[in-house]
Amino acid sequence: VLFRSAQVGKVWLVSYIGNFVGCLILSVIFVLAGASGTADYYAGFIGNKLSIPAGEMFFRAILCNFFVCLAVACGMKCKNEVAKFFMIILCIAGFVVAGFEHCVANMATFVTAALLVPGGISLTAALKSMVIVTIGNAIGGGVLLAWPLRMMSADK
């Protein structure tokens, strides 16, 4: 069990770092393409995003990754490609419209804001947000969805 936990931790760490590198590259391309909007928009947006109370941020993150993992589960269960597409879009749109927090989406948002508004983003506040949201995402996906699904299929 300890070995499996270490393997999961290693996969999560590599995935997290890989996602950050991908967000960094895409944010640079996004900014260089001029597709990122204005610096004024990002300055206000980031200020609001980083001022969300920690408890609220945590629960938004739990709900967010519940939706993300639900999208993955629906995608695996649907046999028809069109049905998969619409189920995934519906689940993802649910968390986006609700304004929930996802650590990978926040990585891209924070990097883009840092590139557009140099000095306009607090590294401490961004790191605090990332820790809270990452923990919430792990609970939302792992405890609220993956674990119950695993328990339901354990006898099979």
Predicted regions: what is each one?
Residues 10-18, 22, 132, 136:
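Alpha-helical transmembrane segments of multi-pass membrane proteins
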Residues 1-2:
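Short, small-residue-biased leader/transition segments that mark boundaries at the very start
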Residues 22-30, 68, 105, 140-145:
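Alpha-helical transmembrane segments and their lipid-water interface positions
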Residues 32-57:
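Membrane-interface interhelical connector segments
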Residues 66-77:
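Alpha-helical transmembrane segments in multipass membrane proteins, preferentially the mid-helix core
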Residues 95-150, 154-155:
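C-terminal transmembrane helix-loop-helix hairpin of multi-pass membrane proteins
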Residues 31-39, 77-81, 118, 149, ...:
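Transmembrane helix-loop junctions in multipass membrane proteins, especially transporters and channels
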Residues 79-94:
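Internal alpha-helical transmembrane segments of multi-pass membrane proteins
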